[in-house]
Amino acid sequence: MAKFDILEDLKWRGAINQETDEEGLRKYLAEHDDLALYCGTDPTGDSLHIGHLIPFMILKRFQMAGYHPVILIGGGTGAIGDPSGRKTERTLQTADQVKHNEECLTNQMKKLFGTENFEIRNNAEWLGKLNLIDFLRDYGKFFQVNNMINKEVVASRLENGISFTEFTYQILQAIDFYHLNKDDGVQLQIGGSDQWGNITAGIDLIHKLEGADRPAFGLTIPLMLKADGTKFGKSAGGAVWLDPEKTSPYEFYQFWINQDDRDVVKYLKYFAFLSREEIEDLAEKTEKEPWKRAAQKRLAEEVTKFVHGEAGLKEAQMITDALFSGNIKNLSVTQIEQGLKNAPSAEAGSEKKNLVDFLVDTKIEPSKRQAREDIKNGAIYVNGDREQSVDFDVDPSSAFDGKYVIIRKGKRKYTLVTIK
């Protein structure tokens, strides 16, 4: 049986930007079944967002093809900060912040990668033991300052200034690759396009210390841009986080289901674990029947299930279906808060109030005349029920959990009214 060509699959998915030695890597994959690869992330926050997820999708694909992924948590480098992609110096974190973030990221990675054929390492294990004299003697002599300055990550910062701390980051990342290659048999490093200089520095160090024939490869992924030219990964509300406390499964699902037709096939190739045939079928449906949004729905299903599990996906779909149909009575308060987090909101007192006055006082309607007209025309719903009587009283005692009255105007214009 022919071995699955992981590199060819990644190329078809548009997931490869640069490779240090494509021929050498292909040869290694053809002759060995034991490839180990890694991608690092510094614990600068307590959650990854979907922009961070991009390189780890590549690791996941290698894992599914039978190879051994290693996630490197930068407990050592995270105390310094990667200058890549930044115009200014990072604010240094406390040891307690770094430790807390390490624990959070480790838990997220375990959810994504499981427990088999996968490991998490922390570069504090070796960098934390490295003293200054050993650093300069054993590693510093292999790095030429003129070469370091010419690397894009440093060159882009020279005009505004870069500290010695961040300047040496590429050496520390090179030591990481060297350590994992020598002691753990890791041959391939994956990173974003801005990591090219750091990756090649690591390969150079490995070859200088272990010999030019030592297998060591690098692969970077392209910068992902939307069809409008803006950077992928942000919603109107900011970053889309993997932590359900920061971005609920519903919000996460909505981010994917609202993707542009021009982008959705690209994202399916990258983020969904679907075959070429399935993706090509969805691409055809998008071209012929874009209004059905079949590709967006499948994309949202696949990525939400990967990050939040089957339960998270089902909850996101339940909230979506309820808000779309207007049948909101079976939603819990938590689900209502998720689904209407970004909807218009208002406050009202705890006393009964005529619906016309309620709509005007909460600024859902601009005037009593307009309120009466919309009520009579059947455009107003209170807690899921259509109300067509101008004499109807809104009773806060029937609010969801005694807390919320939900007004829908028209098909899907919701307002969340909090009872005070």
Curated annotation (Swiss-Prot):
A motif ('HIGH' region) lies at residues 43-52. ATP binds at K234. L-tyrosine binds at Y38, Y169, Q173. CDD domains: S4 (cd00165), TyrRS_core (cd00805). It is found in: Cytoplasm. GO terms for molecular function: ATP binding; RNA binding; tyrosine-tRNA ligase activity. A motif ('KMSKS' region) lies at residues 231-235. Residues 353-419 form the S4 RNA-binding domain. The keyword Glycoprotein does not apply. Catalyzes the attachment of tyrosine to tRNA(Tyr) in a two-step reaction: tyrosine is first activated by ATP to form Tyr-AMP and then transferred to the acceptor end of tRNA(Tyr). This is Tyrosine--tRNA ligase. It comes from Lactobacillus helveticus (strain DPC 4571). The gene is tyrS.
